[in-house]
Amino acid sequence: MRRQEALAGTASEAGREGEQPRPAGLGCRTRAEPGGPQESRQQWKTFLYCEPHKRIKEVLEEELSIKRDECHVKSPPTVALDGIWSIRRNLPVGGTISGQQSRNSSLPQAKYYSRHGGLRR
């Protein structure tokens, strides 16, 4: 008897709002309890997809293409930096310098590069 009164109470509340009666405790995308009065009915929430306006789609595509162009570099970084700085050209490390032959020329010489003083031995 209490269950029927509860259903009648929810039905009268739903009638005031203009909605269909829904059992207490049921949300969207749920089924009614088995054996209940609404067992055969399913209450699913449906969603409708609407495409954006043509002009909005065009603007979004333009922005996307601009971002793609910004991400792609026209020339690879190795080619761009090749003419600016080269280890072989700027740091003669490892090879013997012509004109400076010492008696230990066959032994490897330790050379260090310092940004404050250039090459050091």
Swiss-Prot record:
Its main location: cytoplasm. Residues 1-41, 94-121 are annotated as: Disordered. Keywords: Cell projection, Cytoplasm, Cytoskeleton. It comes from the Eukaryota. One of its GO terms (cellular component) is ciliary base. Predominantly expressed in tissues containing motile cilia. Also expressed in non-motile ciliated adult olfactory bulbs. InterPro entries: C11orf97-like. Disruption phenotype: Mice exhibited no impaired function of motile cilia or non-motile cilia. Residues 98-108 have a biased composition (Polar residues). It is found in: Cytoplasm, Cytoskeleton, Cilium basal body. Induction: Expression is activated by FOXJ1 and NOTO. Transmembrane segments: none annotated. This is Uncharacterized protein C11orf97 homolog. It comes from Mus musculus (Mouse).
